[in-house]
Amino acid sequence: MTKIVRSKYKASRRLGVSLWGDSKDAFNTRNYRPGQHGQNTMIKTSDYGLHLKAKQRLKCHYGRVTEKQFRNIFALAQKMKGNTGENFIGLLESRLDTVVYRMNIAPTIFAARQLVSHGHIKLNGKKADIASIRLKAGDVIEVKESVKQIPLIQESVSKQGQTTPGYLSFDVPSLTGKYLRVPALSDVPYPFEAEVHLVIELYSR
């Protein structure tokens, strides 16, 4: 098991949820914090701690998004018309690495980011190697021909029981998909309760 995989599973235990819904996640069998005091259920969490944990869960779910990037995305969501929480999720879900992950082209958000940064993904027919590129309705994602048969991709797209969210379409044989629309919070298949209202309250203090 790689260092990244070990650390991401430890994050799930630390934050008290399975962050990516992975069956291999250690949280499924050890649903308490890591460390010698991890099973102590008497520790109380402050109001600030609850808000902070909600933010950390959401940020960790999107992989290697830095705190600065996360705050900047939130600031942009605040400036947009409409509901800040819905805008925030819409912006996070329109990132190229997130869309690659949601289309099940990669088994994890980390692998999705790597596929993008290595130039293995095409956006509207052109190589796209920046994970944070924001997609628009109608944008087409495609895996480069030269890497379509690599095991990581083939195993990911062929995994049984997977579905593509309704705001995306994906054709497995051609490994091509389309970003159809900006999703609502209720559309996003989080494996935990995304308490976006707590994140908004935290960043609005």
Curated annotation (Swiss-Prot):
Coiled coil: none annotated. One of its GO terms (molecular function) is rRNA binding. PROSITE patterns: RIBOSOMAL_S4, S4. It comes from Rickettsia massiliae (strain Mtu5). SMART domains: Ribosomal_S4, S4. This is Small ribosomal subunit protein uS4. GO terms for biological process: ribosomal small subunit biogenesis; translation. It holds the Pfam family S4. HAMAP family: Ribosomal_uS4_B. The gene is rpsD. Keywords: Ribonucleoprotein, Ribosomal protein, RNA-binding, rRNA-binding. Part of the 30S ribosomal subunit. Contacts protein S5. The interaction surface between S4 and S5 is involved in control of translational fidelity.
